[in-house]
Amino acid sequence: GTFPCGESCVFIPCLTSAIGCSCKSKVCYKN
């Protein structure tokens, strides 16, 4: 939840979830 993964998740899920990122406020964050 602290480090932006440089990915948006407005229309599609976070592809970066493979490395531990999750969607928050339309942006993918790690931790």
From Swiss-Prot:
According to its UniProt entry, one GO biological process term is: defense response
InterPro entries according to UniProt:
Cyclotide, Cyclotide_bracelet_CS, Cyclotide_sf
Question: What does the record say about PTM?
Answer: This is a cyclic peptide.
Disulfide bond positions: C5-C21, C9-C23, C14-C28
Alphabetized UniProt keyword annotations: Disulfide bond, Knottin, Plant defense
For this protein, the record's SUPFAM superfamilies field holds: Cyclotides (SSF57038)
Spell out the coiled coil positions from the record: none
Pfam families assigned? Cyclotide
Covalent crosslink: Cyclopeptide (Gly-Asn) = G1-N31
* Role: Probably participates in a plant defense mechanism. Has cytotoxic activity, active against a human lymphoma cell line with an IC(50) of 0.96 uM.
Protein family per UniProt: Belongs to the cyclotide family. Bracelet subfamily.
What is the UniProt domain comment for this protein?
The presence of a 'disulfide through disulfide knot' structurally defines this protein as a knottin.
Identify this protein by name. Cyclotide vibi-G
Q: Which organism is it from?
A: Viola biflora
